[in-house]
């Protein structure tokens, strides 16, 4: 289901629907605040939470990949712990791409497992214990900023600079899981992801933030594929599929059709066969995201290309300093 447009009107001029739903949003915020008072498990290794204030996709997965690689470059073995949204396994279980499918562990953990060790656990504290017992020197919590079951040593809030915090209201009146002020008061760093214009707009709409702000962008990973003039039928079931379509256009691809699916939508044989027939009629190549690709039926994995992206920090000094303070300096 796509988010309603009124979630993203300016904070100082909310739509009528947002105003009518405001009491429910206030109740949601109060429930979140009560839940956060519960005590959490303290791990024996640093725990870094990659979270957000918005519901839906903001760029947490590429941020987790970037942090895994950054810590690996320091000689730190970091494990990711995720709830495994969309998967059937409760865990804790270590993700193994050789035997697990997205239906087992969720698409995001399956993708993250290609970059390091990843765990799925409905009970995050149990997942952290399992990762620590398996030798994790640091733990990355994929989401879970509003879940108190694990004590966080560093909380990094990720936001899509193009949409910011929307109208600044909590679900269902807006896109937020909790008020901006309350969330940032518990955070250590804010990462806004987007191009220069989106970053400028975010800075204007949300000035005087109480935490250090990092900026970054999602850059296409060059894999030797020349997209210039390529005729494609693109499909994506991520938080903001239009960003993926824009990336393809920026690479020079000719999008003959772009199909926005629901976030985490299953890619069954019937759906994929329909897309394949449409692509053949258009003389187009099927293309999707890395995260969607792990949900493809086996019979389509060789038929669909991906456009991988990686997070590039504009200046990661504040992040490096925070990692150093956690005792995660480079090791020989």
From Swiss-Prot:
Pfam families, per database record: LpxK
Keywords: ATP-binding, Kinase, Lipid A biosynthesis, Lipid biosynthesis, Lipid metabolism, Nucleotide-binding, Transferase
Pathway: Glycolipid biosynthesis; lipid IV(A) biosynthesis; lipid IV(A) from (3R)-3-hydroxytetradecanoyl-[acyl-carrier-protein] and UDP-N-acetyl-alpha-D-glucosamine: step 6/6
Chemical reaction(s) catalysed: a lipid A disaccharide + ATP = a lipid IVA + ADP + H(+)
GO terms for cellular component: plasma membrane
InterPro entries: LpxK, P-loop_NTPase
GO BP term, pick one: lipopolysaccharide core region biosynthetic process
GO molecular function: ATP binding; tetraacyldisaccharide 4'-kinase activity
Residues annotated for ATP binding in this entry: 54-61
Source organism, top-level taxon: Bacteria
EC number(s) given by UniProt: 2.7.1.130
SUPFAM superfamilies per record: P-loop containing nucleoside triphosphate hydrolases
Intrachain S-S bonds: none
Function: Transfers the gamma-phosphate of ATP to the 4'-position of a tetraacyldisaccharide 1-phosphate intermediate (termed DS-1-P) to form tetraacyldisaccharide 1,4'-bis-phosphate (lipid IVA).
Family per record: Belongs to the LpxK family.
PANTHER family documented for this protein: TETRAACYLDISACCHARIDE 4'-KINASE, TETRAACYLDISACCHARIDE 4'-KINASE, MITOCHONDRIAL-RELATED
Protein name as it appears in the record: Tetraacyldisaccharide 4'-kinase
The species this protein was found in: Cereibacter sphaeroides (strain ATCC 17029 / ATH 2.4.9)
């Amino acid at each position: 289901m796509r988010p309603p447009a009124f979630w993203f009107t300016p904070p100082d001029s909310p739509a009528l629907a947002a105003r009518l739903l405001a009491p429910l949003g206030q109740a949601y915020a109060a429930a979140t605040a009560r839940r956060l008072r519960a005590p959490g498990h303290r791990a024996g290794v640093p725990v870094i939470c990659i979270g957000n204030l918005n519901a839906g996709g903001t760029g947490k997965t590429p941020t987790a990949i970037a942090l895994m690689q950054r810590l690996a470059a320091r000689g730190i073995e970091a494990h990711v712990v995720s709830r495994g949204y969309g998967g059937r396994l409760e865990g804790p279980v270590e993700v193994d791409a050789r035997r697990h499918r997205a239906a087992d562990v969720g698409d995001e953990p399956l993708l993250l497992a290609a970059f390091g060790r990843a765990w799925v656990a409905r009970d995050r504290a149990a997942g952290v214990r399992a990762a620590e017992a398996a030798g994790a020197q640091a733990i990355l919590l994929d989401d879970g900023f509003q879940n108190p079951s694990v004590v966080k040593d560093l909380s990094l809030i990720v936001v899509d600079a193009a949409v910011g915090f929307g109208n600044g209201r909590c679900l269902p009146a807006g896109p937020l899981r909790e008020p901006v002020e309350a969330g940032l008061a518990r955070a250590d760093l804010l990462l806004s992801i987007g191009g220069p214009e989106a970053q400028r707009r975010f800075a204007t709409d949300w000035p005087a933030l109480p935490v250090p702000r990092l900026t970054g962008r999602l850059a296409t990973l060059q894999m030797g594929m020349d997209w210039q003039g390529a005729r494609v039928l693109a499909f994506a079931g991520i938080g903001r599929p239009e960003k993926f379509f824009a990336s393809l256009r920026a690479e020079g691809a000719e999008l003959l059709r772009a199909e926005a699916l629901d976030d985490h939508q299953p890619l069954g044989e019937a759906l994929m066969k329909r897309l394949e027939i449409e692509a053949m009629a258009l003389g187009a190549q099927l293309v999707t995201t890395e995260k969607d690709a792990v949900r493809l039926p086996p019979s389509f994995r060789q038929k669909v290309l991906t456009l991988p992206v990686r997070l590039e920090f504009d200046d990661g000094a504040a992040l490096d300093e925070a990692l150093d303070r956690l005792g995660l300096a480079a090791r020989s």
